[in-house]
Amino acid sequence: MSFQALLHNEAMVQALAMQEITSPTAIQEQVIPLLLEGRDVIGQSYTGSGKTLAYLCPVLLNTDASSKQLQTLILAPTHELVIQIYRQAQLLCKNAKLDIRCQSIIGEANINNQISKLKEKPHLIVGTPGRILDLIKKRKINCQTIRTVIIDEMDNLLDNTNQQTVQEIIKSMLRDRQLAAFSATASNHSLDILAQQMNEPAFVKIEDQAKMNPNIEHFYLISEQREKFVQLRKLLHALDDEAQRILIFMNDGPELDFLVDKLNYHK
């Protein structure tokens, strides 16, 4: 199936093409029509399968840009994922010429700046649950106008650490809102919680025989700590001719900033 047949919106199809995304993945083929119809959805698919676009495209197309109300809330567990989703939403809006206002809200950012930004009446918010709940309690986010809630990385957000916060956010909204949740895994614990909050959800599970995106090659290098940066630079130079985009994952924010500075210096 083509994006034209799925989305029925040429501007969005062209926006995807500008990112060299021309054919839908399996999760996108199944999820996009369901979300466009307003169904609640649980989507389980392997990392790299295109889950973010599976919900972003229909969510943006369902947004009433003429309204000044918040319509969509996307919850993600980490600051990095929030920013990634937010930037993808912004890019789609720009390239599809959608007059939709998006805002990212993360815990480490200045809350007063976020409150000021909320006065611009975003249609879509992407955020981490803790700060989102803070702003709801401060009555800076009106949950009564939200029509769609997306939970990204549901097993992470519905674990014992985040479960109460996420449930409190969802309960602050109208019951007839649309709720969708996505992850590479779906524990019984997460599914039990979602069953209490969803209305006859469609469950979409994409099996992957290799348990990974077939277009991703896995290998690892063992290196002394002092040699890591040198090895990373060699690897990046080796991949430079064949890789258009390269993602580097780290588990430490300050170290990440330091690495970016070093890579820029040693171009």
Regions found by a protein language model. Give the residues of each.
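Conserved helicase RecA-like core
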Residues: 2-267
